[in-house]
């Protein structure tokens, strides 16, 4: 820095420039055309803002957008920097200004074209600091003055409002009043498919070969006058009539009233009267209560106004659609790829990571496996400042289908491959590089993002490839694609039996993954204690040279990493297992709220220059304190659309003595397809959203009779979903046709509040992100590899005054409804049992007869049998009836 100061001083000696001689300078540009000749726009660079202590959002804010600058400081800056000074265009105005301080104003909305403007007159400065009061007559007169300056506002789509014009158009439109006759002519079914031969034939040679349509006069069109449009209106005659009573005899008269007062004697007697004393004693308590209420609460407040929401908010309430802010596409990839997972960087605002995979089926992957080995599988880091070039590229042995940033250290990333391996990256060496990206700085420096035309992408930028630190063992890990991965919280850790212990290290050291091979695995990134000690010679033989660009953070895990414990969800009596696709732990809602905590931890880690992951101790110790009241149950979504609530703790099998996974606590088959999303609400610990197949469901952890909400079948299959981060009753659902359904439970609970088209193909992932209290974004990835960044409107990002209480009341009401349905089901089953018992009793009563009745019935049956036998024998001629007696003679 010292040589630069010498150069500046040498310049000052060689070419001194008098400041007061400003006749040769060009005239400064003012805003006389806009009616403000005292205003001179300026462009102040960051260096000039630091010199004059007028930095945006630090020295100059929205509450105080101006600063008084000493005239001598401007002259000093002109002497030091000459024509390079930002005040050089207004040098003449500064010289002619009579006062000692000039008013510099920050033009946030670029009303006058630049980011600052200078007020060149004392009168203008006084009018800005102390604006004159405008009378009501002048304000009414201003409404009729046409404005010469028009600010262009882009058109915004608004919902159509009916004003009745469509009814007039329908009345004037011509519609057919008569019903049309339709003829359908077809061949016989026996002649279908018969060969057809066409030939020439004379129409006159065959009888009835043709039908002649001769012309004849139509009587329907012989009317001379058809119709006439005639309009008539009856209007009564109007007369103006007025009456006025005349004041014939005017007189001036005045009237005055005065109150009747007690005399002194009456006052004394009234004070001593018992009724007055009793009244004062009884009324004094009520008066004291009323006075206390007046002191405690404001009795003049208007409760009706407080029912509505505040109007002085950011954004347009009528705008309910997502607006596309930016999009990212990997233009340098030679193959067609899709985005499988999206994650915003927890601490660096404006940085987002996506994993991409080749769009091939299983058979095509096997066929083109040789070519796919030559192409790297990547996780791309995109920044808002450069939509073309990725900031970082994380390499992996195969395509990544899910990944997560470590909650304790955002520079540690874990991902799951399609081949069943877990990959670990450490980007600590590149943290400073991605933190200093243009447009992606910390949240404290800026409150809003810059538009794209103000950002300058870096030219001739080379892609930064980062190799992985460690890969899990192929033999001991998953056998198929890893569909979901989660970090366990830094407050606990588990052992091989699933028991929960206190985590004394204070960092996240364990992972949980689920795969399509019907297993759920828990992993520990710390080095495990070897069963047998190894000699130093053997260690030297097994040592492998590490490339210089690969950190040694997780070198102890590379190709030898095994799961701590493995779970299989059996289907009960059968030998088959459930195939998990997504899981949701009880601690997931806590990890969603740790962005500020991670930011503070990253700052302290920088100050200490010590990464705790570089000195990891061995696995779970024996002296850790167990946590007894910890909930070890979690939700699992399967490939068949089942939602399972199970426990990761092991139990000992009484027959074999081995530790086996527990049976699922509950199982519901709600979805008719693969479960793509299981996510806990960021506002309620026990509310879970599941998305799969053609419908959506919302569950409560303590209610296992069924879902609180189950949507009907959608027009297209659902592929992803996510809760809103700021509104408890809003969640976003992606479909396979490129539409996104936005559900608002305050508005509708049976269907989406609105649907919006985002792309032309399937939506694969949805991730919202809070940039500032006034601005939110949502990242939507599609099947063609494009990442869409959309801005969330005000109505979908800002909750109402009582939204959380209303949604909580809705969930409680649905819980009561499920309990009522369950009670009615039990009552109905009991009623059915009672009805069956009554029917059985009636049947028993019918068949239980007395002995006399049974003998009488048997006697009647026997007599009927004898009669039948007699008739049969008579008909056969075997017997004859004599006239003398009633006996029978056998022939």
Curated annotation (Swiss-Prot):
User: Where is this chain's protein located in or outside the cell?
Assistant: Cytoplasm
Question: Which named protein is this?
Answer: Dynein axonemal intermediate chain 3
Q: Does the keyword Ion transport apply?
A: no
- Positions of the region Disordered? 1-27
Per the record, the GO terms for biological process are: cilium movement involved in cell motility; inner dynein arm assembly; negative regulation of Arp2/3 complex-mediated actin nucleation; negative regulation of cell migration; positive regulation of osteoblast differentiation
Question: What terms describe the molecular function in GO for this protein?
Answer: Arp2/3 complex binding; dynein heavy chain binding; dynein light chain binding
Q: Which InterPro entries match?
A: Dynein_IC, WD40/YVTN_repeat-like_dom_sf, WD40_repeat_dom_sf, WD40_rpt
Locations of Basic residues compositional bias?
A: 1-16
Q: Which domain of life is it from?
A: Eukaryota
Q: Which residue stretches, if any, does this entry annotate as coiled coil?
A: 817-861
- Keyword terms, alphabetized: Coiled coil, Cytoplasm, Repeat, WD repeat
Positions of WD repeats: 395-435, 477-533, 670-709, 713-753
Q: What does this protein do?
A: Acts as a negative regulator of cell migration, invasion, and metastasis downstream of p53/TP53, through inhibition of Arp2/3 complex-mediated actin polymerization. Via its association with the multisubunit axonemal dynein complex, is potentially involved in the regulation of cilia function. May play a role in osteogenesis of dental tissue-derived mesenchymal stem cells.
**Gene Ontology CC annotations of this record:** axonemal dynein complex; cytoplasm; inner dynein arm
SUPFAM superfamilies registered for this protein in UniProt? WD40 repeat-like
User: What is known about its subunit structure?
Assistant: Interacts with ACTR2; this interaction reduces binding of the Arp2/3 complex to the VCA domain of nucleation promoting factors. Part of the multisubunit axonemal dynein complex formed at least of two heavy chains and a number of intermediate and light chains. Found in a associated with the catalytic heavy chain DNAH2, the intermediate chain DNAI4, and the light chain DYNLT1.
